[in-house]
Amino acid sequence: EKVTVNYGEVLDYKHETIDKLVSGVEQLLKANGVTMLKGTGTLLADRQVKVTFAEPAEDGATESYYDAEHIILAGGSYPAKLPVEGMELEGVLTSDGLFALKEIPESLTIIGGGVIGVEFAEVFSALGCKVTILEALPKLLANLDKEISQNLKMILKKRGVDIHTGASLAKIEKDPAGGLICHYTEKDKDQSISSQYVLCAVGRKPNAAGLFLDPEEFADIAENSAALTTKHLEAAAQTAHDLGITMERGFIETDIYGQTGAPGIYAIGD
């Protein structure tokens, strides 16, 4: 009865768990004879990779070059944001930023009713946060069976989550009283909701462009993939094309074996 959560300890446990997992993987790599370098890799011609070190090496070197018969590109992904006014405001978060908060939000509006959005809705509503989901499509978890979607919607509503489907976000603005206001359209009616924070959970984008961009020339994305612009994508696509690799909307095209258009160069990941 009246159970509360020490959110600080929850975050400490999360960080400790992540650190243990990362350390464990690093030890496995080392035990299997894998050399690990910390830095930014850039693919060059003739199956060569330039590595710009995160910190200078013991000899003072800031970069090095490596040649290989086979190269695997695994750039991962980063949280996407909608091209909507107000997305840049303080308090509008992605999944990366939400768990960086030091305390449980009093209220949270989640843009997106996909897997990521629903997961965070369940977690933060259980922690005592007032959660609202705005989903543009007619139902939650649009890629899943209708029955699953309906059951999850009922479960979330019983837990106090407000759900608005068919809700198209128009803009986000600062609330004079504090927090943020999301303006959206639902059933042809203009609506708005205020909350302490807004989570943009509309999927993820491929993080491949940086593999083809010189980190010194495009320093703004070396530490922040979300800073990618059309200019970056076009430059990356052109460089990739020159290497025999095709990119489409940031994705690297491969054949059924995961090989790109350049012999010996493969791409993996989601």
Residue ranges of model-derived segments:
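Core beta-strand elements of the Rossmann-like FAD/NAD(P) dinucleotide-binding domain
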Residues: E58-H70, D188-Y197, G261
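FAD-site-proximal beta/loop scaffold in flavoenzymes
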Residues: E88-I104, Y197-D270
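Feature captures the FAD/FMN-dependent oxidoreductase FAD-binding
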Residues: V5-H70, I163, A170-I181
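Dinucleotide-binding/catalytic capping subdomain of oxidoreductase cores
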Residues: K2-V34, I133, L152, R159-I163, ...
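Short glycine-rich anion-binding loops that position phosphate/pyrophosphate groups of nucleotides
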Residues: T42, S77-P79, G203-P206
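Glycine/Thr-rich phosphate-binding loops of Rossmann-like dinucleotide-binding domains
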Residues: G39, K81-P83, E119, F124, ...
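A structural signal for the hydrophobic beta-strands that form the central parallel beta-sheet
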Residues: M36, L73, T94, I163-T165, ...
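Rossmann-like dinucleotide-binding cores of NAD(P)H-dependent redox enzymes
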Residues: L11, E16-V22, E26, F99-A100, ...
